């Protein structure tokens, strides 16, 4: 079982990137052995300028992490997405997370042609991202079937919220690595053969998340994990997890970029979420503590 952390992008109150907090987050994930995904929806990738994204990725690569590092490629303008892929091709990353184009709602042929274009441009393997709640369309099963043997098609991150659809992806492309993209569904998707979890909660609890990923049917882990999810996921991601990280002093500020706002999260949820994870069974080895 593998764990990748969908990493937040820390900001100062003036909106600039807090690179010191980012380094702290990445170093902790590296110490535990969790891979990282940068500039996805949790990383507010669509809210960063091209120069900011370039600076962030180069900064992360300069840290020489020992764990896999994946980079998000969200966008709707193909020329810009291809330009971003070409920039990242020359960097020592592990691969891309390629999101179904948002807002435009492509049908089957358009989606296949889009992913063909971005996969053909990539020199690193890619995980395609099924996220219909944000993209307004799913990663179609026939798209997966058409691209199943593309040499750069490594896997799928499934945040569709359906175990049945997850199983359909697996039956169509059994050789593709399937990642659960929702913290709340890890136990069910692990039982269906998931390769791993791409987690948001692991930003704040990297060791606990790793234990749960390795032991998805352990009832004590599952109960505490689900209780924490109940408090964190009361609003749009990454608002809740940034509030948690700031509370735990993992990042300096819970700053987000508009249209996201910390005002859309009840800060009274922070303490119960943190307290619920304090009941986690004592880890065999502890690498660090945020607070």
From Swiss-Prot:
Enzyme class: lyase
Keyword check for Lyase: yes
Pathway: Amino-acid biosynthesis; L-lysine biosynthesis via DAP pathway; (S)-tetrahydrodipicolinate from L-aspartate: step 3/4
InterPro entries, A to Z: Aldolase_TIM (IPR013785), DapA (IPR005263), DapA-like (IPR002220), Schiff_base-form_aldolases_AS (IPR020625), Schiff_base-form_aldolases_CS (IPR020624)
Key words of the record: Amino-acid biosynthesis, Cytoplasm, Diaminopimelate biosynthesis, Lyase, Lysine biosynthesis, Schiff base
Active site: 129, 157
Xref: Pfam families: DHDPS
Reaction(s) catalysed (UniProt annotation): L-aspartate 4-semialdehyde + pyruvate = (2S,4S)-4-hydroxy-2,3,4,5-tetrahydrodipicolinate + H2O + H(+)
Annotated binding of pyruvate, by residue: 42, 198
Transmembrane segments: none
Example of a GO biological process term: lysine biosynthetic process via diaminopimelate
PROSITE patterns linked to this entry: DHDPS_1 (PS00665), DHDPS_2 (PS00666)
Main subcellular location: cytoplasm
GO cellular component: cytosol
Record GO terms (molecular function): 4-hydroxy-tetrahydrodipicolinate synthase activity
Enzyme Commission no: 4.3.3.7
Family that this chain belongs to: Belongs to the DapA family.
Quaternary assembly: Homotetramer; dimer of dimers.
Function description: Catalyzes the condensation of (S)-aspartate-beta-semialdehyde [(S)-ASA] and pyruvate to 4-hydroxy-tetrahydrodipicolinate (HTPA).
Name of the protein in question: 4-hydroxy-tetrahydrodipicolinate synthase
Gene transcribed to yield this protein: dapA
């Amino acid at each position: 079982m593998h764990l990748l952390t969908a990493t937040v992008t820390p900001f100062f109150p003036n909106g600039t990137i807090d690179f010191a907090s980012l380094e702290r987050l990445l170093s902790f994930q590296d110490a535990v052995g969790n891979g990282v995904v940068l500039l996805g929806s949790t990383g507010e990738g669509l809210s960063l300028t091209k120069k900011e994204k370039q600076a962030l990725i180069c900064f992360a690569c300069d840290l020489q992490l020992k764990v896999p590092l994946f980079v998000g490629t969200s966008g709707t303008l193909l020329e810009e997405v291809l330009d971003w892929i070409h920039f990242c091709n020359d960097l020592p990353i592990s691969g891309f997370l390629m999101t179904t184009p948002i807002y435009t709602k492509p049908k089957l042929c358009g989606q296949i042609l889009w992913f063909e274009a971005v996969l053909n441009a990539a020199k690193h393997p890619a995980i395609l991202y099924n996220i219909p709640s944000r993209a307004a369309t799913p990663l179609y099963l026939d798209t997966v079937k058409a691209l199943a043997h593309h040499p750069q098609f490594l896997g799928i991150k499934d945040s569709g919220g359906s175990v049945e659809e997850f199983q359909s992806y697996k039956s169509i492309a059994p050789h593709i690595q399937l990642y659960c993209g929702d913290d709340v569904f890890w136990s069910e998707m692990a039982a269906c053969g998931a390769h791993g979890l791409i987690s948001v909660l692991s930003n704040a609890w990297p060791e606990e998340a790793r234990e749960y990923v390795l032991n998805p049917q352990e009832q004590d882990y599952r109960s505490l994990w689900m209780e924490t999810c109940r408090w964190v996921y009361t609003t749009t991601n990454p608002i809740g997890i940034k509030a948690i990280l700031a509370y735990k002093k993992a990042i300096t500020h819970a700053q987000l970029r508009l249209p996201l706002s910390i005002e859309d999260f009840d800060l009274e949820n922070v303490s119960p979420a943190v307290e619920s994870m304090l009941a986690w069974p004592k880890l065999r080895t502890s690498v660090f503590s945020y607070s």
